[in-house]
Design a protein with these regions (language model features):
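Membrane-anchoring hydrophobic helices of lipid-metabolizing enzymes
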Residues: 2-98, 108-110, 117-121, 289-291
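Catalytic core of membrane glycerolipid acyltransferases/transacylases, capturing the structured
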Residues: 40, 48-52, 96-152
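Short, flexible loop segments at the rims of nucleotide/cofactor-binding pockets, characterized by
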Residues: 59, 72-78, 101, 149-154, ...
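Short, charged beta->alpha transition segments
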Residues: 80-86, 128-130, 159-166
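Generic beta-strand structural signal
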Residues: 95, 120-123, 140, 163, ...
Length: 291
């Protein structure tokens, strides 16, 4: 009896919650992480993908405000940015900035570094998972769920509400309308997937000029290698393809503002036209306006 009472009095150990980096990796690789091979494969993948560095970064920014967290990541990466066309960027007033997406999260860091001196009020559309790493990102990132199957009415309402507040406050909003990394097309040219028309619709609704931006950065080697044979392996490279850009060079080209009333009334058509301009004209002739 005494032994039984003693056993009942001993608190049951509670497992510590999984680290957010582990959670995000396993969510992106559900089949692999539930397979019998995962305990064997995981240490190898984590070593390859720089898991320790990703975890350290996540722990560092978790308690920070959004601006401090973004500056921390910017300082951590110390990306070298060559900027052209900065004179085209309006210094005040509402803007919707749209750009291609060649390398991953580092594209946003490079754009931030390039534009923050002129537009310190810049805020980004970003995958909603970023806020799970750092809740303070509300200051600098608007959470967006790019995967249609994961969208909910509440998440969409939050995105739209924050968008309205940002543009009514005359801030600059940066969007990567592809929502996914670029791939090589049939001709071997790095090309974004079809751009979602959201950014154009928002610009038209709030009468905000659109500033096109072209981003050129280092090749995302592991992302494209894994993309050939496994979508899950490809998707868990997100932290690796951010942190391995440390000290690397990006080129940012800024085009002339596009008045929203000059666009095709069909947002999808207008979005496709701007995408073509950003990818095929802007990096070679930044002074040539979109027509």
């Amino acid at each position: 009896m005494a032994d039984a009472a003693l056993a009942r009095s001993v608190p049951t150990a509670v497992a510590a919650p999984a680290h957010i980096v582990d959670v995000l990796i396993e969510e992106r690789a559900p089949k692999l992480s539930r397979s019998a091979a995962w305990p064997v494969v995981r240490p190898l993948l984590y070593a390859l993908l720089g898991y320790g560095k990703a975890r350290a970064m996540a722990d560092a920014i978790a308690p920070m405000g959004g601006k401090a967290a973004l500056d921390f990541v910017s300082d951590l990466l110390a990306i070298k940015v060559d900027v052209s066309g900065l004179q085209h960027l309006p210094r005040k007033g509402r803007l919707v900035i749209v750009g291609n997406h060649p390398t991953g999260i580092a594209d946003g860091v490079a754009v931030y570094d390039a534009l923050k001196a002129v537009r310190p009020d810049i805020i980004f559309y970003a995958n909603s998972d970023a806020h799970r790493v750092c809740a303070g990102f509300d200051e600098t990132l608007i959470p967006v769920e790019w995967v249609a199957a994961k969208r909910t009415r509440d998440r969409t309402r939050l995105t739209l509400t924050m968008t309205r507040e940002v543009l009514e406050a005359e801030r600059a909003l940066m969007v990567f309308p592809a929502g996914k990394l670029a791939r090589r097309d049939a001709h071997g040219v790095l090309t974004d997937p079809t751009w979602m028309p959201t950014a154009i619709s928002v610009a038209v609704k709030y009468r905000a000029p659109i500033v096109p931006v072209h981003v050129e950065g280092p090749w995302a080697t592991l992302f494209h290698l894994f993309d050939r044979f496994s979508g899950e392996l490809r998707d868990i490279t997100l932290f690796h393809e951010l942190l391995n850009k440390s000290g690397q060079r990006f080129r940012i080209t800024i085009g002339k503002p596009i008045p929203p009333d000059r666009l095709d009334p069909d947002a999808a058509v207008a979005s496709a036209a701007i995408k073509t301009y950003v990818e095929r004209t802007l990096p070679f002739d930044p002074d040539r306006p979109f027509v």
